[in-house]
Amino acid sequence: GHPAITTAGDLLFGISIDEPPEGWKIPNPEKVKSLVAGLIDGESVRVESSVENIPWIISSDLPISEKGSLSIKVTEKSIKKGERHLTFHPPVLVLGVGCERGVTGNELIELVEKTLGENQLARESIACIASIDLKMDESGIHQLADYLNLPTRFFTNDELESQTPFLKNPSDIVFSAVGCHGVSEGAAIAAVGRGGSLIVEKTKSEKATIAIAKSTSDIDIHKFGIARGKLNIVGLGPGKVDWRTSALTDAIKDSTHVVGYKLYLDLVEDLLKGKECFFSELSQEESRARKAIKLASSGHNVSLVCSGDAGIYALATLVFELIDRENCDDWNRIQIEVHPGISAFQAAAARVGAPMGHDFCAISLSNLLTS
């Protein structure tokens, strides 16, 4: 054999074989070099695809021929050991999940692994997990998503009920429980759209059901359903950059939306590039908390910025009080993470020395948010 410089393939054929589009996976990357070497030597390539739309391959300058001596295979099917084709797994599958409350992640994982194996499907081709919004806070589903390293998307019962004509196994029992005739099949079909198809019908375990649908092209998860929203409640400390926690920095960087008192947002201005920001003046704490909760309940990743520590005379308590008081389904389902910060009393104590080395009591001198 001889070495093949893959950048030569980029220059000659207008395609980066070893860097496919986002979401595509190569299960046998060791085949890349030999294929590129053959192309450089003048050989043609045969393309076998189970997916209709593969423009990044077809529109390239690859010497594609039905009689090519080299081969590229595009498939959602798992490959056998020793597969001779260079294989690509495109993101064209959606895993629909329905379950009873309290199902374990392990039960879901075992059901998915068993079903994928029986149907010879590659987990690398699954673009996301889809379900009904009633299950947005179901820990078992999120454990499955973490295990598969996949995003989740959720639909309302009305959206899933509109898929009833396309279900293979509609259920009146499911309808009486959640308001649609099928969750796993309905969610999978809703995600892939009308051009897609159900390729694995509802499959059951004791407390869960799954189904798998296939799209005709790459799945864009931003075009359907909503994600489970996340609300980060972050304390920025006394204001000095070097007294911020790394958790605060990461939370704001990962957020799409940031809410806070104008002065507090000014203190983290270096982290706000590309974020949608909402601010209000002092004494409007409840409106800020409500805004942050509503944004998160719409599927966004939100940071609510407080001074000091978010849980000490700050907005974390107010957020939990509002959610408890309103008892709104959309609000109850969001993921909340409180990130601690350095409180002003800790900063003042550090300037003095160590006055709080033993038991102590903190008393607020303000009648705002503490009465």
Regions found by a protein language model. Name each.
Residues 2-43, 225-230, 329-337, 343-371:
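Beta-strand/loop-alpha-helix module characteristic of Rossmann-like adenine-cofactor folds
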Residues 9, 76-78, 100-101, 195, ...:
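Short glycine-rich anion-binding loops that position phosphate/pyrophosphate groups of nucleotides
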Residues 19-89:
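Accessory alpha-helical/coil subdomains and C-terminal extensions
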Residues 68-81, 85-88, 185-220:
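C-terminal edge-of-domain segments
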Residues 87, 91-108, 112:
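Glycine- and Gly-Pro-enriched alpha-helical subdomains that act as flexible
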Residues 112-126, 243:
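Phosphate/pyrophosphate-binding loops at sites that engage ATP/ADP/AMP, CoA/4′-phosphopantetheine
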Residues 125-132, 303:
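Short glycine-rich phosphate-binding loop at a beta-alpha junction
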Residues 142-143, 148-178, 185, 226-339, ...:
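Class I S-adenosyl-L-methionine
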